[in-house]
Amino acid sequence: MANSANTNTVPKLYRSVIEDVINDVRDIFLDDGVDEQVLMELKTLWENKLMQSRAVDGFHSEEQQLLLQVQQQHQPQQQQHHHHHHQHQQAQPQQTVPQQAQTQQVLIPASQQATAPQVIVPDSKLLQHMNASSITSAAATAATLALPAGVTPVQQLLTNSGQLLQVVRAANGAQYILQPQQSVVLQQQVIPQMQPGGVQAPVIQQVLAPLPGGISPQTGVIIQPQQILFTGNKTQVIPTTVAAPAPAQAPMPAAGQQQPQAQPAQQQAPLVLQVDGTGDTSSEEDEDEEEDYDDDEEEDKEKDGAEDGQVEEEPLNSEDDVSDEEGQELFDTENVVVCQYDKIHRSKNKWKFHLKDGIMNLNGRDYIFSKAIGDAEW
């Protein structure tokens, strides 16, 4: 392809385009309250993007060229300094070898194995403040705690997680095993109160226990303070529950029974007979008007349908239109030329183009031309 393109003018063209755009939008930006520094940053970003694309050679300002020259001069000096520093690092290990031979060995005695901590509970009230994570909730695992002698043989305790535990004396008589019982929803405080006669009645405040099996789920349960009686070696727990009856539902009327009417039926107005002539013809006129209105609606629908049919018809020369998909396929190529044309000649499958005032991107480089002539076959 013969053309009069000049690569030296490409950077000037791009720079003139950037300056024209920045100058044209400066007044608009100032009217909108945008600082002029934003325009300078936009211009710098535009130039950097153009240089990174490497589509234009020589697109550097005088200041940028000076910076590139200074950087090129500093690179040999940095390489020499790095080489000298690398030789100095290689000489250091030879000097430090004798010092490493004089190092002394220090023996560190092995630490004793840490013994497992023992949990000592001085009072039964402190069991309420224990962390629930330290007690295993599995049914097959029992937590063994060493309790003082002041704790009663059988006692129920509540943890922070709402779990009910029971203290049972083991066979050896030296340990107490906490067995998990049924969990409760809410627990507050267990205040043991001693009553005369050796009876200990812990008062459970705001404790919601699971429902007993004999009470239906629809019936409310009110939990009362439990009493634990000690008679020799036997223990008896007497729970006192009061079942709150469910609210009675209103009886539904039978299916065959009709409800009495709340209001008496309104009396119909008496009929007045017309004896002075024939009946009125207003109803016939109304029917005629309705028929005319229906006819008008049908005519309007037919007209609308005809118009819709015309719109659905394919317009003339529709095959000549270029769809969007074809437009995208045309630009899916590496080499692109945007220009105007003077003449195009065709002979069978050979084409000859006379182009002018264009810019093209070939093999990643941009070129501009005023006139160009090209041949093609397809």
UniProtKB/Swiss-Prot annotation:
Residues noted as binding DNA in the record, renumbered to the chain: H345, R346
Statement: the UniProt record of this protein carries the keyword Lipoprotein: no
Any GO CC annotation of this UniProt entry: transcription factor TFIIA complex
GO molecular function: protein heterodimerization activity; RNA polymerase II core promoter sequence-specific DNA binding; RNA polymerase II general transcription initiation factor activity; RNA polymerase II general transcription initiation factor binding; RNA polymerase II-specific DNA-binding transcription factor binding; TBP-class protein binding
Post-translational modification remark: The alpha and beta subunits are postranslationally produced from the precursor form by TASP1. The cleavage promotes proteasomal degradation.
Acidic residues bias locations: 282-331
Subcellular locations according to the entry: Nucleus
Domain of life: Eukaryota
One GO BP: positive regulation of transcription by RNA polymerase II
Residues recorded with modification N-acetylalanine: A2
Comp. bias (Low complexity): 69-79, 89-106, 247-281
Main subcellular location of this protein, as a coarse class: nucleus
Cleavage, annotated site positions: D276, G277
Induction line: Up-regulated during germ cell differentiation in testis.
Signal peptide: none
Location of region: Disordered: 69-108, 247-331
Residues found modified as Phosphoserine: S282, S283, S318, S323
The family this protein is said to belong to: Belongs to the TFIIA subunit 1 family.
SUBUNIT field: TFIIA is a heterodimer of the large unprocessed subunit 1 and a small subunit gamma. It was originally believed to be a heterotrimer of an alpha (p35), a beta (p19) and a gamma subunit (p12). TFIIA forms a complex with TBP.
Function recorded in the entry: TFIIA is a component of the transcription machinery of RNA polymerase II and plays an important role in transcriptional activation. TFIIA in a complex with TBP mediates transcriptional activity.
Stated name of the protein: Transcription initiation factor IIA subunit 1
Organism: Mus musculus (Mouse)
